[in-house]
C-alpha cells in the first residue's frame, strides 16, 4: 500500500505543470522538426515531400492560433477544407502535422520532469522495473523451462477514443491540452468511430508517429500498472475500503458499478492469485503471462483480467483474446518466432554390477523456429515471389542502378539472418535466401533484357558475396583455400544478437507497402 501511495504522490506532482502555453513558442516546432530528421527512425516531416522547416509558416500558425475563432472553425467543420481555417491543401497538411508533432513534444514534458534522477533510482518500486527487449529471449531460455502454462494475451483496445484522453487526466490537468488532443482524434476518426476502425487507426499512426506512440504507451502503461501492481501487491485487495485508490479518475464510480455486477468480490480473499513464479513479457500489442501454477489458476487469472479491464478501465477485452496453452504441447507466435518448450526423451543405459537397465530421462528444451509460412507470405506480398514461394522479379526496382538493387536484396537477406539468428533450425532461412537471390537475378536480368544464366555468369562470385551473412563471411576467411564448403553445419547454432531494436518489417505483413 505504501508503494502505491508513493506512486500516487509522484503522479500528483506531475499534475502541476501546464504545457499549453508552450504551443505558442516557435522553438518547440523547430525541435519537433529536428527530432523527425535525426531520430532513430526517420519519418517524412509533416506528411509532405518538402522536408524544409519554414519558420515563417510557423509564425503564421502561431498568429492564427491567437485568433479567437481559430479552434471554433476547426472543431465545428472538421471534415471540410476549412480545417484550421485554411483551404489550401499544403497549408492544411503542414499546419495539422506541425501541430501534432509539437503537441507530442509538449505533452511529454510533464512526464519527463516527473521521472526520478539517478540518485533516486533506488526508490523506484519493483513493479516499475522494466527490461529491455535485448533481455527477452535470454529470459525465455532461462525461465520457461520451469513453467507449465502460458497465457497469450492480445492487449485490449479502448472502446472509444475518449478513453485515451481520460487516461491522461490524472497525469496532466492542463485542460486546453486535453481539448487539443480531442481535436486531433476528432479529425482523424470523426469522433464517432471506434478505435477498431483500421483505416483511421493506421492513418493516425502513419501521419502522427510521435503522438501515436505517446498515446499508445500511456494506454498500455495504464493497463500494465494495474496488472503488475495487483500481481505483486494482491494482498491489498482484501481491504473493503477503496480509499487507497481515490487518486484514479472515476475509480470509485467504477468500483460501485463493479460491486453491483460482482457483489462481495473484494471481500473474498483471492489467495489463488499469489503465484511467486508468474512472469510477464510484452512487445508491441501482445503479451505473455507464464506461470508454474495449475490450469485452474490460469483460468481464474483469465476471468479476472477480462472482468477487471472491462469494468475498471473500460477496456474492451474479449475472452478469446487471452489464450491458455500448455507449454509442452503448443507453440506461440511472439516477436516473429514460434517458441515452444518440447519434452525430449533420452534413454540412458545404466550398468550396476552384473545388472543393466534403461533409464527414461525427460528433458525440456526451449525451442524457437522460424515461421516459414508467414515469412514466405510476407515476401509474396512484397512481390519477391509467388504465394507458393516461386521467385519472381521486382519491376519497381528496375529503375535503380545495379549496385543499389544488389544492396537492397542483400540487406534484406542479411537482416533476416541477423534477426532470426537465435532460431534452432535455420534451413528455412536458406530457402528465403534462395528466393531473394533468384529474385534479385531476375530483376537485374529484366533490367538489362537478358537471361538469368547470362547475367549470373557475368557477375560471378560478386553476386554471391552480396548475400553472405556474418557467420558465412567468418567461415570464408577461415577456409579461403577451400573450393567447396557447406554452411549446413551452422544450422543448429543459436546466437542472440543484442543490437535488435525493433522487429523486422518482413515479420509483420501490415508494415509492407
Curated annotation (Swiss-Prot):
Q: Which domain of life is it from?
A: Eukaryota
**Gene Ontology CC: one annotated term:** chloroplast
Q: Keywords, A to Z?
A: Chloroplast, mRNA processing, Plastid, RNA-binding, tRNA processing
Q: Which gene encodes it?
A: matK
- Please explain the role this protein plays, according to its UniProt record: Usually encoded in the trnK tRNA gene intron. Probably assists in splicing its own and other chloroplast group II introns.
Q: Name one GO molecular function term.
A: RNA binding
Q: Where in the cell is it found?
A: Plastid, Chloroplast
Ranked from the top, the taxonomy reads: Eukaryota, Viridiplantae, Streptophyta, Embryophyta, Tracheophyta
Provide the species name. Panicum capillare
The record, for Pfam families, names: Intron_maturas2 (PF01348), MatK_N (PF01824)
Q: What is this protein called?
A: Maturase K
Xref: InterPro entries: Domain_X (IPR024937), Maturase_MatK (IPR002866), Maturase_MatK_N (IPR024942)
Entry similarity comment: Belongs to the intron maturase 2 family. MatK subfamily.
UniProt record, GO biological process: mRNA processing; RNA splicing; tRNA processing
Broad class of the protein's primary localization: plastid
Amino acid at each position: 500500500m505504501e508503494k502505491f501511495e508513493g506512486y500516487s504522490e509522484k503522479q500528483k506532482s506531475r499534475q502541476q505543470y501546464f504545457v499549453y502555453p508552450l504551443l505558442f513558442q516557435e522553438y518547440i516546432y523547430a525541435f519537433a522538426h529536428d527530432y523527425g530528421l535525426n531520430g532513430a527512425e526517420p519519418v517524412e516531416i509533416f506528411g509532405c515531400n518538402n522536408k524544409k522547416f519554414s519558420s515563417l509558416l510557423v509564425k503564421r500558425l502561431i498568429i492564427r492560433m491567437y485568433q479567437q475563432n481559430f479552434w471554433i472553425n476547426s472543431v465545428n467543420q472538421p471534415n471540410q477544407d476549412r480545417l484550421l481555417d485554411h483551404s489550401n491543401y499544403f497549408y492544411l497538411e503542414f499546419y495539422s502535422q506541425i501541430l501534432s508533432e509539437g503537441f507530442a513534444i509538449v505533452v511529454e514534458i510533464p512526464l519527463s520532469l516527473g521521472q526520478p534522477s539517478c540518485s533516486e533510482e533506488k526508490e523506484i518500486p519493483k513493479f516499475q522495473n522494466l527490461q529491455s527487449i535485448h533481455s527477452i529471449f535470454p529470459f525465455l531460455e532461462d525461465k520457461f523451462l520451469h513453467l507449465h502454462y502460458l497465457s497469450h494475451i492480445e492487449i485490449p483496445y479502448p472502446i472509444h477514443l475518449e478513453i485515451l484522453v481520460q487516461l491522461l487526466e490524472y497525469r496532466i490537468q492542463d485542460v486546453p491540452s486535453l481539448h487539443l488532443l480531442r481535436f486531433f482524434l476528432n479529425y482523424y476518426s470523426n469522433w464517432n468511430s471506434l478505435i477498431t476502425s483500421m483505416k483511421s487507426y493506421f492513418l493516425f499512426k502513419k501521419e502522427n508517429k510521435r503522438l501515436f506512440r505517446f498515446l499508445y504507451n500511456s494506454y498500455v502503461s495504464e493497463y500494465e500498472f494495474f496488472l503488475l501492481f495487483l500481481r505483486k501487491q494482491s494482498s491489498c485487495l482484501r481491504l473493503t475500503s477503496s480509499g487507497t485508490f481515490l487518486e484514479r479518475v472515476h475509480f470509485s464510480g467504477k468500483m460501485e458499478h463493479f460491486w453491483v455486477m460482482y457483489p462481495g468480490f473484494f471481500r473474498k480473499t483471492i489467495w489463488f492469485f499469489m503465484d511467486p513464479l508468474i512472469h510477464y513479457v510484452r512487445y508491441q500489442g501482445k503479451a505473455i503471462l507464464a506461470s508454474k501454477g495449475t490450469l485452474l489458476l490460469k483460468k481464474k487469472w483469465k476471468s479476472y483480467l477480462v472482468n477487471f479491464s472491462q469494468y475498471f478501465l473500460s477496456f474492451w477485452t474479449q475472452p478469446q483474446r487471452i489464450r491458455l496453452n500448455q507449454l509442452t504441447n503448443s507453440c506461440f507466435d511472439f516477436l516473429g518466432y514460434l517458441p515452444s518448450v518440447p519434452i525430449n526423451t533420452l534413454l540412458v543405459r545404466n550398468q550396476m554390477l552384473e545388472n543393466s537397465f534403461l533409464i527414461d530421462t525427460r528433458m525440456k528444451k526451449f525451442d524457437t523456429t522460424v515461421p516459414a509460412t508467414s515469412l514466405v507470405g510476407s515476401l509474396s506480398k512484397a512481390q519477391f515471389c509467388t504465394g507458393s514461394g516461386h521467385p519472381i522479379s521486382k519491376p519497381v526496382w528496375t529503375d535503380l542502378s545495379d549496385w543499389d538493387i544488389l544492396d537492397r536484396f542483400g540487406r534484406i537477406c542479411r537482416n533476416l539472418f541477423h534477426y532470426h539468428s537465435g532460431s534452432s533450425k535455420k534451413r528455412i532461412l536458406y530457402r528465403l535466401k534462395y528466393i531473394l537471390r533468384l529474385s534479385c537475378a531476375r530483376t537485374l536480368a529484366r533490367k538489362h533484357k537478358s537471361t538469368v544464366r547470362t547475367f549470373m555468369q557475368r557477375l560471378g562470385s560478386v553476386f554471391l558475396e552480396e548475400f553472405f551473412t556474418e557467420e558465412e563471411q567468418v567461415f570464408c576467411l577461415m577456409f579461403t583455400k577451400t573450393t567447396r564448403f557447406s554452411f549446413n553445419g551452422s544450422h543448429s547454432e543459436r546466437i542472440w544478437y543484442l543490437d535488435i531494436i525493433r522487429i523486422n518489417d518482413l515479420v509483420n505483413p501490415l508494415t509492407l507497402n
